[in-house]
Each structure stands twice: as structure tokens, then as C-alpha cells.
Amino acid sequence: MMKPWTVLQELEADNSRLKKEAIIKRESDADNKDFFDGVCMALDGFRTFGVQKVPTSTKDGAGLSQDIFDLVVRQLEERTLTGNDMRDRIDELCATATKEEWNDWYRRILIKDLRCGMTHKTVNKFSKYKVPVFDCMLATDSAKHEKKMVGEMIVEPKLDGVRVIVICDVDKDEVTLFSRNGKELLNFPEINKQFDEMLDQMSESMVFDGE
């Protein structure tokens, strides 16, 4: 069984779409669960870790097991590991892992960017492992649909800003901001704070979509 970081290196090294698809199918047929578990952690927009900065490894440690990493990821998802404790624990993981393990695998999962030119679409189409799809409604240029532009309609200016989808989860007592591509946004603390103050007034979980 190929190590997950070795598979990722192979995907990153080849720009061919067909080659990437073949690699994904090969690993799926080989039942490389560790690889696809990590891929799903990184590509699933609904799984967030609350991590802003993840260090790069500069020297080899003894090696980090997937089980230990998975345990920490679970704590990050449940927000039972936060703040300075989170930072210190991630630093410990970085020091424990080899450079190859950390920089080419574990770190990329935590920053939710595999950097290998592969999306959830490739995984879902060419493997038995599936990644939940984070999707939002997007506008289409009316110039491509002129025949539909008849009758009365409402027109508004096109906003030029940052698309933000806010998920207010009353069960988890948590507010999370996402980009249109499902990447967690951590650079709008004031917006997050405003929605967090509204959370106690909500009787059910809600989603807000805006620019």
C-alpha cells in the first residue's frame, strides 16, 4: 500500500488530468483508506478545524501515525482543542512527523489545500470513496440567455466583494463562515461575532448567503 504523501506527490508531479484520474482509481481499487480519509478531511467543506496558521517542518521527526493525527483532527472539529493548546499540539505533531509526512500530507489536510490539482469531483467520479459537495448558487451572464430575458423582472447592481456563506449551527452552538468554494473564512471576526450574538435567538440552524 502506498503511503498517502507518496500518492499526493505523484498527483502533484503530473499535470495530466487523465493521469490524476488513473491514480485515484488505482488507489481506490487498492482500498487505500488512509489516503482517502485524509483527502476527505481536506476536501469536505463541511469539516472545519478552526486553524489559521500551520507551521512547515524543517527537520525530520520520528514519524507521526495516522491514528494520532486523526484524534487531534477530531478534537479540532469538535472545538475541544483551541487557542494556545491547539497551537502547541499542532507544533508537537509537526515536530513528531518526518518532513515528508508533514509538509506533503498532514499539513495540507489542516490547511485544507492538497495542492495537487485535484478536486472532490475527481474523487467522487473515479473512486468508491465520496466527498460531500459544498455548493452555492451562482449567477449566470444574461447575455447567454437573451431569449429568457422577457417580461417583468427585478434588477440589482452586481456586487463586487467577497461571497460569504454563514452557517449558524444551533446544535453545535457554532457559527462558521465559508467562501463560495467551501473554504472556511477566518478573516471576518466582526461578522462572525455578530452572527454568534444572534445564535441564541435562533430556534433552528440557519444559513445566510451574501456578498
What are the roles of these predicted feature ranges?
Residues 1-211:
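N-terminal nucleic-acid-engaging modules of covalent nucleotidyltransferase systems
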